[in-house]
Amino acid sequence: VFLHGGPGGGVEPIYRQYFNPEKYRIILFDQRGCGKSTPHAELKENTTWDLVADIEKIRLHLNIENWIVFGGSWGSTLALTYAISYPRICKALILRGIFLLRKLEIEWFYQYGASNIFPDAWEKYISVIPESERDNLVKAFYKRLTSSNKDERLSCAKLWSIWERSTSKLIPMDKSLHDFQSSKVAEAFARIECHYFINEGFFEYDGWNHASCTGLAGC
C-alpha cells in the first residue's frame, strides 16, 4: 500500500512507477480531504489516527492478510505510525524522505532554516503575513487557512503550497508547481497540512513515533 505525502498531497499517477505491476498488487488511495476523497479540504475527523484506521479498513475490505507499506515524507510518518499500531500486519516498511513531524522539523522548514537556503521563495511565502505575526508562521497561516474569507483562504493556500513544493526538491517539478496554482489542490494541501502541523500530528508527545518504533524489527 502506498501512502502519499502532505498531509493533503493526494495520489498522482507517477507514484505507480515505484512498483512492478507484474509482481505487486499496487494499492493507492487519497487520504481524507484531498484528491478524490470527500468532503474536500475537510478538517473535521481528520487526524493521524483517523488515517491509520482508514488504512486498516482498506486492508480488511480487500481481504489482504499482510502487506508492504510504502511511504515518503508525510507518508513515512503515517507508515511508521500504522506499523507501530499493527506490527504483525506489516511484512515490511519502505520509507523514503523520512519525516517524523517533530517540532524541530516543522520549525526548520516553516519558521527558520530553509529560509536561508531559499530567500527569494521565502519572501513570497511570508508576504501575506504581517510582521507582528511572523514569530509563529504556522499559527498565522492556520488562522487564515481556516478563515471564512474565501479569497484570503485561497491566496494563503497557494503561497503555503508553492513554498513547500518549490523548496522540497533541489530541482522543482514544473508540473507540481503548476498543480498548486489550482485553488482546489492548494486549498486541500495547505489546510490539511497546516491542520496537522499546528496539532503536532495528534501525537501524545513530540517525537512519539520515533520513540515508539523500538519494537519494530530493524529499528
Regions found by a protein language model. Name each.
Residues 1-39:
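Conserved HGGG/HGGXW glycine-rich cap/lid loop of the alpha/beta-hydrolase fold
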Residues 40-52, 104-113:
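Catalytic nucleophile-loop/oxyanion-hole region of alpha/beta-hydrolase
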Residues 140-177:
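Accessory cap/linker subdomain of secreted extracellular hydrolases
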Residues 167-219:
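Conserved serine/cysteine hydrolase catalytic core
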Residues 76-87, 93:
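Short glycine-enriched nucleophile-adjacent loop
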Residues 88-141:
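A catalytic-pocket lid/entrance helix-loop region that shapes and gates access to the active site
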Residues 69-71, 96:
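Short beta-strand immediately N-terminal to the catalytic nucleophile in serine-hydrolase-like folds
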Residues 49-68:
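Conserved acidic catalytic loop of the alpha/beta-hydrolase fold
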